[in-house]
Amino acid sequence: MKNRILLINLGGPRDTSEIEKFLIDLFEDPLVFDLPLPEWIRKPLGKWVAKKRAPKVAQTYKSMGFGGGSPLVSETSKQANAIAKALEKITGEKWEGNITMTCGYPDIRKLNRDFLVPTKQNILLPLYPHFSRSTVLSTAKLVEQTTKFCPVSYEGWVAPFHSSQVYLESIRDLILDFFQNRLNRKDFLHSDSFQGVSNWETIDLIFSAHGIPIRLIEKGDRYREEINSNVENLKRLLYEKGFRGKCHTSFQSRVGPSKWTEPNTITMLEQLGKNGVKRVAVYPISFVSDHLETLEEIGEQLKKIAYNNGIAEYHRIPAPGIYPKFIEAMAKIGLESIQSSKNECICKKLGGHFPNLKSGECPINF
């Protein structure tokens, strides 16, 4: 059997024709579109919301300059190839990099079972640094539908990696390389504006994460806790390298009227401007590749809000993508997942209350 690593991401439409499929997969997922409704109401409602949002979303994707779609799938493919090469360099063996998406194409539901069974020679890497029911648990459940067993207790399954030292150091170095204009622009999208940051040691740094509904936190989701821990660790590493600016944590991409994790990044920028802050850099801490939420939301929408609130200097730090130190970190984290067997179902430890669970049952089925 050949060595393989499978990168799993949420997904994004590659062109206009895939937008509706992407949104339907997103809003039909009970762990993403998590509402206190009977399934016979929730699922059709999710499909209706997807169809209603599709035209507006299409206009946003059209403005990004990627043929009416998202670059996320192609960027993930670049990461898979780069990580496979890094694994070959570390192990001296041949590795094959593959990708699949939980929403849209390539569809995880259509993938051959052999690719979804985690083993020492078949690493499954969900590209989420932090746990959330709507990402990691949703991914595990989709894998289980094909394999017929919960994958997270098996060697070869990569758990959320926000606390990994090699990951943390790679993100610290990415931020510092951006500040000091040392990034290879060919490795990043929309990089023409990368000019470095003068007096970077004192700029205000916002770690902006994708928000989630508070109802998920109330169910035991550890996402917010892990974001905060990630920020604290990065602050420590940055301060050790001479950074002295203030660090802030906020959440973006809210959808709908329900209460989400706070503070919202919009509110954060408004407050910083009100307080007289003139220089801000934003890093997308919950994302590992650039796409709609980083290029359009952080790069354009939030920049306008910053300028409208008196902030004179605004920088979008890119997601890691194929940044070499990040790629090497992901390869090492992947190998760590096969070096010791967990031999237990760890779904409960990943967060979430499951009141209907019987003793010994895996919550992935709920």
UniProtKB/Swiss-Prot annotation:
It catalyses: heme b + 2 H(+) = protoporphyrin IX + Fe(2+). One of its GO terms (molecular function) is ferrochelatase activity. Its main location: cytoplasm. Keywords: Cytoplasm, Heme biosynthesis, Iron, Lyase, Metal-binding, Porphyrin biosynthesis. Pathway: Porphyrin-containing compound metabolism; protoheme biosynthesis; protoheme from protoporphyrin-IX: step 1/1. CDD domains: Ferrochelatase_C, Ferrochelatase_N. Signal peptide: none annotated. It holds the Pfam family Ferrochelatase. Its EC number is 4.98.1.1. Belongs to the ferrochelatase family. HAMAP family: Ferrochelatase. This is Ferrochelatase. The gene is hemH.
